[in-house]
């Protein structure tokens, strides 16, 4: 029985090591109008006293206070996110067709201040030009927070992977503890960007300019489709939240 329990724990751990939740957006429902909104973050900094969110209105809050900010927003229903595997983001497209994509969208029922903070951090890591020193300090702070729930585990793993990916592709860090957390597809793409190997260009089916790399999935096209991630996510949200009513409580 003990061996079986350990096996189940290992399987659960493996699942959270290969899955990420990306493109976490706020769901806003006012009357019958449903929309997806980006987080109001313009920067994050890390100090001895915690992780700090710099907001669009010029204020700065401790990341653990972000839950209060979100819950005060009119019509806030929670977050929507996309579950992906390492191999599915090529930095050019998301390797999911529209049918598969719809099955990966989730309504994120987050409860704790830590979970709200992690949702904000995923957005920041995907979208904001963060300093190298901030990335170095961030994970050291995050490991101090207990990952007690499945959603906390997958959010932490997502942040960890994004931090290592940013350190590798933007700051040219190649330490083994960084590289083994960077998805192989992204490592290959970064190699193509630097060396222009024709075989890799054929594999990725692209001859585009490689000067700009963006970790945000919002504008990624889906596989075999002209639809972008944000378009299909918005369609899903409008359908789901219209049928399910208020999900904020």
From Swiss-Prot:
Query: Where is it mostly found?
Result: virion
Is the keyword Cell membrane assigned to this protein? Answer: no
This entry carries the following GO cellular component terms, namely: host cell Golgi apparatus; viral tegument
Pfam families, per this entry?
Answer: Herpes_UL7
Subcellular location(s): the record lists: Virion; Virion tegument; Host cytoplasm; Host Golgi apparatus
InterPro entries referenced in this protein's UniProt entry, alphabetically: Herpes_UL7
Q: What domain of life?
A: Viruses
Q: Does this entry carry the keyword Metal-binding?
A: no
Enumerate the UniProt keywords alphabetically: Host cytoplasm, Host Golgi apparatus, Virion, Virion tegument
Membership in a protein family: Belongs to the herpesviridae cytoplasmic envelopment protein 1 family.
Q: What does this protein do?
A: Plays a critical role in cytoplasmic virus egress. Participates in the final step of tegumentation and envelope acquisition within the host cytoplasm.
Tell me what this protein is called: Cytoplasmic envelopment protein 1
The protein's organism comes out as Human herpesvirus 6A (strain Uganda-1102) (HHV-6 variant A)
């Amino acid at each position: 029985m003990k061996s079986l329990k350990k096996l189940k724990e290992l399987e659960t751990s493996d699942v959270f090591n290969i899955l990420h939740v990306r493109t976490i957006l706020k769901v806003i429902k006012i009357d019958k109008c449903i929309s997806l909104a980006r987080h109001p973050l313009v920067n994050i900094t890390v100090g001895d006293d915690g992780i700090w969110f710099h907001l669009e209105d010029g204020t700065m809050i401790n990341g653990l206070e972000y839950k209060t900010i979100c819950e005060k927003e009119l019509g806030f229903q929670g977050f929507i996110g996309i579950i992906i595997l390492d191999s599915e983001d090529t930095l050019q497209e998301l390797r999911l067709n529209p049918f598969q994509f719809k099955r990966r969208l989730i309504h994120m029922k987050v409860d704790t201040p830590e979970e709200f903070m992690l949702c904000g951090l995923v957005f920041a890591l995907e979208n904001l030009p963060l300093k190298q020193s901030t990335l170095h300090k961030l994970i050291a702070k995050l490991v101090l927070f207990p990952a007690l729930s499945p959603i906390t585990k997958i959010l932490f793993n997502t942040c960890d992977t994004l931090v290592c990916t940013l350190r590798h592709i933007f700051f040219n860090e190649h330490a083994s503890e960084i590289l083994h957390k960077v998805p192989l597809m992204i490592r290959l793409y970064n190699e193509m960007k630097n060396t222009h190997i024709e075989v890799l260009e054929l594999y990725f089916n692209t001859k585009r300019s490689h000067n700009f790399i963006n970790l945000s999935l919002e504008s990624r096209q889906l596989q075999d489709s002209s639809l972008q991630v944000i378009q299909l996510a918005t369609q899903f949200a409008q359908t789901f939240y219209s049928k399910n009513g208020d999900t904020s409580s």
